[in-house]
């Protein structure tokens, strides 16, 4: 369960950040519904807050169950949440295009998702590549999209490639750590078995086989 702590801490940070953004939206002149763009941001904040809260509640529920239940359901749950988080970052980035030409949200959300989760290589390739394609398919329909399509495509592809290699590095590191742990556990089991055999031999007469 200690391996879940970084994910839980990150989810709590996301909850706090979204709560702050919702409060700031409410305090702005005109509120969160003054324009369609503000409404879009508002509902994205609410959606991420709700999904993250549900994610945390499910983790707590799984932690209270038996260990096999946690092992079975946590990784698929984490994969789904990572895909959702990347999609959320892309939607915010598309809204940003109506007030500028920044890919900052797409960049830090994608790289953070790669660094804070453990995905199999095919999962990271599918999530990050699909997210990048989704972004670049919709960018031309934003005000500054046609004029900046090439630069946005290049930058988003570099971010996606970086996210894939970051995710791959963390995955290989996790696999190596688990393999080393399993080897140590097997060696400890062998040592305990040998100690039991030696203890039995020490209390057994070698000629008669009697203790």
Predicted regions and their residues:
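Amphipathic coiled-coil signal-transmission "stalk" helices
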Residues: 166, 173-187, 191-194, 198-201
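Short conserved micro-motifs on helix faces and helix-strand junctions that flank
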Residues: 115-117, 206
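Conserved nucleotide-binding and Mg2+-coordinating catalytic segments in signaling enzymes
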Residues: 199-211
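N-terminal membrane insertion elements
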Residues: 117-126, 131-179
């Amino acid at each position: 369960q200690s391996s879940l702590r970084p994910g839980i801490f990150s989810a709590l940070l996301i909850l706090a950040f979204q709560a702050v953004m919702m409060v700031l939206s409410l305090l702005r002149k005109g509120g969160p519904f003054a324009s369609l763009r503000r409404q879009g941001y508002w509902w994205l904040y609410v959606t991420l807050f709700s999904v993250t809260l549900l994610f945390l509640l499910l983790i707590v529920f799984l932690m209270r169950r038996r260990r096999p239940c946690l092992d079975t359901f946590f990784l698929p749950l984490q994969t789904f949440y990572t895909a959702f988080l990347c999609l959320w970052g892309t939607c915010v980035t598309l809204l940003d295009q109506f007030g500028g030409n920044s890919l900052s949200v797409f960049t830090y959300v994608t790289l953070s998702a790669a660094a804070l989760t453990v995905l199999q290589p095919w999962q990271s390739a599918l999530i990050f590549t699909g997210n990048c394609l989704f972004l670049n398919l919709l960018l031309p329909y934003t005000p500054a999209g046609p004029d900046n399509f090439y630069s946005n495509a290049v930058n988003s592809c570099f971010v996606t490639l970086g996210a894939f290699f970051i995710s791959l590095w963390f995955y290989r590191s996790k696999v190596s750590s688990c393999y080393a742990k399993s080897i140590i556990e097997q060696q400890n089991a062998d040592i305990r078995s040998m100690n039991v055999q030696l203890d039995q031999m020490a209390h057994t007469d070698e000629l008669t086989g009697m203790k």
